Amino acid sequence: MEYTVRAARITDIEALVALSGGSLGDGSSGPLGPADLMRQLVFLPHATVLVAERKRDILGGAVLAIRPSVRAGGYVGTIDLLVVDPAGEPDAVSASLIEECLRSAANKGCASVEAQQPDDPAEQKRWKRQGFVDDVPVLRHEVAPAGRRR
């Protein structure tokens, strides 16, 4: 059955958060919860929030965040969230969402796009079919927002 990938609207965010289940943070590291943060990202030029829908039902979604990188020689896009309804067509929907994220990243001048390594082997295969390759993980240090420091 046919579905459409389009830019998300703020009215889509609750459905996207519900579809995400426990994959989103609880908001404990910042003042905004996941839904509030995604609503802001809808309007920011350095982010792309997408949804896949069929007959007004959200089948999946993706968030692409863009940051500058001197090392990469331009901007780097990060697909920060990719969720699909397992009852739908997860392979086709995720492929369409990733493809649209890559198109958006190219249009915004990104030199590369990265994503977190999935734990699920089937999900890993989906990413590799889209041209993603294994890369060395990054070092990370959590920083408490200024209002939450003790």
Label for each model-derived stretch:
Residues 28-49:
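Active-site rim helix/loop that mediates acceptor-substrate recognition in acyltransferases
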Residues 1-11, 146-150:
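Conserved N-terminal entry element of GNAT/NAT acetyltransferase domains
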Residues 105-117:
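Conserved GNAT acetyl-CoA-binding A-motif
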Residues 81-90:
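A short, internal acetyl-CoA/4′-phosphopantetheine-binding micro-motif in the GNAT/acyltransferase core
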Residues 51, 57-66:
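Conserved beta-strand in the GNAT
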Residues 18-31, 70:
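Helix-loop element at the rim of GNAT/NAT acetyltransferase active sites that forms part
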